[in-house]
């Protein structure tokens, strides 16, 4: 089940509400990434406390470990991981195609060597839909080929991007057919591909629109292309997605990327950046980024961000976070992750309010000014 309400707009920025089988998601929203069914360093209780409304799981990795038999004994991923709110799962395609020479692509699907034990495995649109049905994810993603930015060390050509995109379209039809055959009560999103070429993106979107997915994602960005190319494609595709369906930008990105995405009509985002950077001591604030390992923070009694309401900023100094990071304490990674995810979710809350009050462009200007100012 998916019901999408477009509550208001401000330019191309959209304020919406997505109702799914496990709850309601207010958009624009950021989805923390829980690759193996766990958002690294965070408990479900902590995710609830910072305002997470939906998380992302990884079909490919959960299929390999713990395996569908384990998840099935819990009647799905929600009970297995102790999370009662919505979950989106990707199709597994991106991970398979990231295996490089370890995989072989045919029209039927992808044969590859398991990165866990070397076993020969096969993944297709049908199998991806079956896995995601067992996981019982609220939002299922079609199986697609993520067109790489580079092939053999050079940008993909128009012909290469076209072949990849058209196979993804054929796989979209097979994904839709299998999703319907399984009588999956959840939602299925199609993924717009086409590389860096606007005409191919248009062809992809036209084909996907005929299949009437519950929502539409922009794939194949933040895969190594220059930032200006990413923004050019985003600016072209975002406003062209069906207005009455939710829009999802996959795997992107920085706080600046999120604000730009919302400006171009995106409703949903995911990225490992806030959690991965947190574990590496790279912290986001409204006034720029803090590299907590730097000696400048050794004796700094201030919080990361005096305007931040997260548990970390309310209770701990930069000096303490610096100390934890330098000695490799687990608590450091946890406190850093709490802060970074809170910052991302607070940024989305602020954008929702700005759109409701029809002052998104003013918010966008102030956001850029604050981030450029840097921490002091």
UniProtKB/Swiss-Prot annotation:
Homodimer. Within each dimer, one monomer is responsible for RNA recognition and catalysis, while the other monomer binds to the replacement base PreQ1. One of its GO terms (biological process) is tRNA wobble guanine modification. Belongs to the queuine tRNA-ribosyltransferase family. GO terms for cellular component: cytosol. Keywords: Glycosyltransferase, Metal-binding, Queuosine biosynthesis, Transferase, tRNA processing, Zinc. Pfam families: TGT. The lineage of its organism: Bacteria, Pseudomonadati, Pseudomonadota, Betaproteobacteria, Burkholderiales. Its cofactor is Zn(2+). This is Queuine tRNA-ribosyltransferase.
